[in-house]
Amino acid sequence: MGKRPDIFRPGCFSANDATYGVLCDLGFIGGGVSIPGRIWLERFCVWSGAYPYAHFAHGAFRQCSGALPFVEIPLSVDLTTPLRYNPVGFHHHPDLRPGGVYSETDEVAYDRRQLLHGILQRTAADDPPIKTLVVDVHNDRDFTSGDSQAAKDLSAVLDGIEPECLALGWEVVPATYDEVIRHYSAVHGSSVQRQIKRSNAEPAGASDA
């Protein structure tokens, strides 16, 4: 590769409460480890209740924000849609991926533009400090053929982003993971450092119980 990787995404979004700490020890600065709401026990993937927007990862509990020097940028899912069962074997909130989990076509059909609308409307209501839209795209799909369902799904998402954002008064800013991670760290890193200093200053045995 020519350089040491510093951004991480696990297959199937598998993780446990030790994952973020290990990633930090290995030099990773951020990535997309979580998929809010998915429950897939066979893949060691449980993200029920996970914080759905960019945040610093937690060292003891993967589901919430914390103070680790790892910027987590979750996959965007439609939280306005109730948890549904996917026949591949998991429960989830639908996301914008083109095609299915392991196939060119959906296991369960979804209107990508409707999902996009739900995701952005929920983001507007929650108003997180940094608003991101993350789509899971697999490189084994055919995005060149007009007959490809994956290509149609991706086009529906891409064609819908600007009008949906304009309706909310937002400017669309294309960005890589690295750019978002470094921007988030620059803007919010000082508050995390203060939190770490406060924690280190607490007397032994202090508790919020």
Please give the residue ranges for each predicted region.
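Short, surface-exposed connector motifs at secondary-structure boundaries
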Residues: M1-D6
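Conserved aromatic-histidine-acidic binding/catalytic patches
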Residues: I7, G11, A15, S145-Q149
